[in-house]
Amino acid sequence: TSQQLAGEKLAINTDQWDGYPVERQKFYKIITKSQANIVLAGDSHNSWFSNLYDDDKNFVGVEIGAPAISSPSLADSYGDFTDIIEKSFIEENDGLIWVNGSYKGYTSLAIHKDYIDVSYKYVSTVKSKDYLSLKPYTFRVEHNKPYT
């Protein structure tokens, strides 16, 4: 996400990709050349699933952002506004397909020759030994193809 000021893009957060546009494009060239089209991320403490595109709008891969298990997430900071924030992220980011800033858990991958099954697995609470496993969100990523 970036803002426009006098025709120039300004970084919103220099601790994420919009703060490193040159490096992002170099990274995209590396993963395109290697045909390693799955990018795993996790520092945001929220669940993300995105198609990645370079500056020329060419597909370069899929980003899988893993949730936090105990670190603060969107819901911890914004509570009831989390759904609104998630929707605005999707509206403002062309490649972003899905985001969940509410649940704690982990992401698992089942890797096959031509595709990867991605499963975001969550629990009802991390504040008690008594918890429920929630229904996972799942995606199938085909090799070198954007998710549709």
Give the positions of each predicted feature.
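Long, structured stretches of catalytic cores involved in phosphate-ester chemistry, encompassing
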Residues: 1-148
